Amino acid sequence: MSDFSMETLKNLRQQTGVGLTKCKEALEHAKGNLEDAVVYLRKLGLASAGKKEHRETKEGVIAALVDERGAALVEVNVETDFVANNSVFRAFVTGLLSDLLDHKLSDVEALARVMSSQEPSLSVEELKAVTMQTVGENIRISRALYTPVSSGQSVGIYSHGNGKAVAMVFLSGSENQEALAKDIAMHIVASQPQFLSKDSVPQEVLEREREVFSSQVAGKLQEVVEKITQGKFKAFFQEACLLEQAFIKDPEVTIQGLIDRAAKASGEPLKVEHFVFWKMGA
């Protein structure tokens, strides 16, 4: 039987900001004494972290990893750019990627509950508290994504600005087109498309754009309106859709043209299945 009440456990969690498991451990070690439990957590480097949890976090890093387990992406924020480049913080972020891949998670709350691959005796939430204590700043895991990688897929990752923006591209038809996938990922970071293709643009977006275009040519003859509207839609697709965009490294060819050229050269049926683009704080 425990030597402490649920009320004491609740008070310890509120006072320290430390996770449930470690608070139980502390109270068991302290035989139910709240003050001794706080001291125990402080010795572990956990207790003072809770005081930092309400500080604003505007800096940080977006990190990505792909291996035989799949592909993972995580955004982790801190207070200053100095800590964002700190080796301890970066190691914590790298560990999160491995945790996402191990557990196939895209949920931040679920990630916080799993045991850390870096420090198996601690949950991710508890290791975050230890890392906060070490770097002296608040840390917030903002978002996470796990995506399985199928056989016959190539995945390209491009990171810009030391992790301020990251794109990940999933290319089907070959496992040997990482360079092409990375080139497309680099293009995505530079051009920031909203959609993959014309067919993937939601109907409500098309209707909104048509309404805007129509208002711009109100009063003109119908055939003129149609011609102008078609031209405006073409320009919209070229700006908003990845496959319609001019390749940043060779504007004479579209991204679809680039893929077709590579497919012809390799004899492989290459296709961009989907992409992910994250920008810090967006």
From Swiss-Prot:
GO CC annotation, single: cytoplasm
Domain of life (superkingdom): Bacteria
Localization per record: Cytoplasm
Keyword Cytoplasm among record annotations: yes
Primary location class: cytoplasm
Gene Ontology molecular function terms on file: translation elongation factor activity
Record keywords: Cytoplasm, Elongation factor, Protein biosynthesis
Chain residue ranges for the region called Involved in Mg(2+) ion dislocation from EF-Tu: 80-83
CDD domains with a match to the protein in the record: UBA_EF-Ts (cd14275)
InterPro entries associated with the record: EF-Ts_dimer_sf, Transl_elong_EFTs/EF1B, Transl_elong_EFTs/EF1B_dimer, Transl_elong_Ts_CS, UBA-like_sf
Matches recorded under PROSITE patterns: EF_TS_1, EF_TS_2
Pfam families in UniProt: EF_TS (PF00889)
PANTHER family reported in the protein's UniProt record: ELONGATION FACTOR TS, ELONGATION FACTOR TS, MITOCHONDRIAL
Family statement drawn from the similarity comment of this UniProt entry: Belongs to the EF-Ts family.
Function: Associates with the EF-Tu.GDP complex and induces the exchange of GDP to GTP. It remains bound to the aminoacyl-tRNA.EF-Tu.GTP complex up to the GTP hydrolysis stage on the ribosome.
Entry protein name: Elongation factor Ts
Annotated source species: Chlamydia trachomatis serovar A (strain ATCC VR-571B / DSM 19440 / HAR-13)
Gene behind this protein: tsf
